[in-house]
Amino acid sequence: MYAAATESLIKQAREIKEEELQRFCGRIFKLLHAKDVSGDTVDSLQRLNLIVSATKYARELPSDLVMKLQMVLRSSSCPEQLQVLSSSIVRESFPPSVHSLSSDLSHDSRTFSYVASVILAQAGNKEDVMPLCHHLLKSLESRLSDGEISKHALPILSKMITVYPEMLTDDQVNLVSRKLVDWLRYASMQQGASMTSGGFFSGPRTRQPAPLTEVDGVVTGDFFTVLCVGQSYTEDQWMNMYTFSMIKNWLLTYDTDGTTNTESDDRSEVDSSVMSMVSATSSSSRLLPPKERLREKAFEYCQRLIEQSDRKALKKTDTELQKACIVESVSIMDIICGEDPSYVYRAFPCIKALYGRLHGDLAYARALLPIAQFYLNHSETAAVDSDAVFCQLFSQCPAEQFNEPMLAFEFVQFCLLNASVLQDRVANYRQSFPNILKFLAWNSSGLIAEYVELLPSLIAPDTAIELLHTILDLPCLAAALDLQQRSACYQASDRTMWDQQGAKVAACLEAFRQPSYRGLFLYILRPEAGTGDTIDRLKMLHEILADMAESPRVVRCAQVVPVLLHVYFNTITQKADEKMMNQLLLVLLERSSLLYNIKTFNFEVQKVFSTHLQALCKLHPPLIVDQSREILDFASSPANIYSKEDFYTHVVWVIGEYLSVSYDPRCTVELITSFCESLEAVLFEITQVRQSASPPSFSPRLITVLMTTLAKLATRSQDLIPRVSLCLSKMRTFARSGPVMACYSEEDTEEIITRAHELINLLKLPNVAQFVLAPSVGGDGPRWHRDTNASLPQGMRAVSGLLHRHSSFLPT
């Protein structure tokens, strides 16, 4: 979110009129022709930059101003601040400047980089960037002096091939590959020359080049890498660093099958095996084609970086650099091994040693992800056991570093990228869903899109029900993780720090450390499925965590649960068998009244339950008979109306829709009668008219659904018709009572009366009523009997109209 002042500035920039913009551009044009650059010039350019950047579409600027900005952009003598602003303005403005800027490219490194950024931003196809590409390649071929464009060529080239990978020809790919090898492997071993003060009476003098050192201060004895430390660096050392930064992208683009280089694709299998043996010998690497030689040198470079990462860094920044280099090196080695399996046997000793060194250090948790990726891709080739790696990854990382947002994102991306392989080959992937969901519980707002995509891969038949409970308990997990984090920070003896967290949090912290509640928290924080009870004492846990229900983290987590539930049910209904369907229905009934009490959370979850209750029963109508006892217990309790009316209404509706011998031959008259009697008792209880009665706290929709369901059941056991008709006849008195008239609108009361009257008339013709209200097992098209949750179908209204017009012919 922007601050109010910033929002105001952006709004002004978006709403500026065209005439005002043209006048402002004319003023800037005059300022740019002044000999000296004033503060007013810079301020005006900054404002113009805001104007052209604040809208999604490109703003059209006067052509003379655009040309002047291009001149500033190309001029190496202009202050860099003006070049930066000019580049940004031209990049966002109209008309495009691609062709005019490409016609005369500068050899000055700073100017060239700003011009290139505009060309890459405005290019519409590879032809637009072709002049820039040729200029770059020409600069790479020639040996330019220090300070010219070679230092900036590789970042620009990397961006270019990302957007237009097909732009380079085979010869150009080979040219760049050869240059990358030289920069990667043969950078100088001395520090760059630096100027030092010569004292008061003498001028500055050049310090003699000193040797480079490792991160631990030892003089470097091997070739230069990004982990070599110096006060200053030479041009080729900078190129070495740039090369390493882009080598992964280069290998992914031009070191795979089917790329522009056909030399390696055309070799026979014998030739390929020979080349692999040659590549295994570093001394023979010059015999290799450019791509294979680059692969070899990149592999050696990564091995050296992994060796260097074992050194104890003197500076914290170097420690962070070591971590980043490990991640990048293992990823590059993974790519190389994927292209040439002969490297797998050379890489695994190094990777295994690296894992052995890092797996116990949480500071290197992010480095475990590329290591796990390497094992996933190549452990079968090398016949190496990878169980320990994935056990570590799915158990320790989420449990102990759930609060690391970058690790959380990369972890979920790893799971998404490899979901199908993890399901098939990693036994504890699906078992670890309680741990995997900890990242979501802590970082819910930032990871919801990723988990929507990931969740289906976590659903397995043996853990599906537990996963559903875990999703419903996700806000409890967020609260428990919060308490775990606070408990680790504040010692039990430090009561002042506890009290600073607030009385509510302090009470929850106290409960978190109580031995009597330890089992509850151990369950909710469990690392894998199948450990502990599911919901035996869940209500107690909700009471303990009641004071955390307003925590922003818990509230945000609760908001993602309905989204995940939709994904879960949409996935599970495609693969669930009859047993699973029955279990799901029981969970819906049980958990509808066993949810963490967060504002709107219960209501939103029950809405999801209502939707998918109908879907489950439609897919498998015998569920109503299978779980008749539990459904009857639920429907017989008026208390469920007041706490979960929407879900209760849907339960009543599915009873009327699917409790029929048409769907299940086990549906006996006795079963129908028991349901009818229970629902009749509920309807009677909630519609009793007393003078002192308070207005009803339920909707008219519930009344109409109950009445319709009773009528449906009566048509399936005609002995029930008299008592149902009697019950329906009392609805007019209820609807016209004072408390109801005060609560419901005239339209609502008329709907209740009309519905009751139509049903009574319909039940006077049992055979017709059965046609209108009885379900039809077959047919997906329009059905006369089909009821919605709030109104009767057209067929019923038609029959009722006939009964009104011919009332003299009705049987008495």
Name the predicted role of every residue range.
Residues 1-812:
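Extended, charge-rich alpha-helical scaffold/interaction domains
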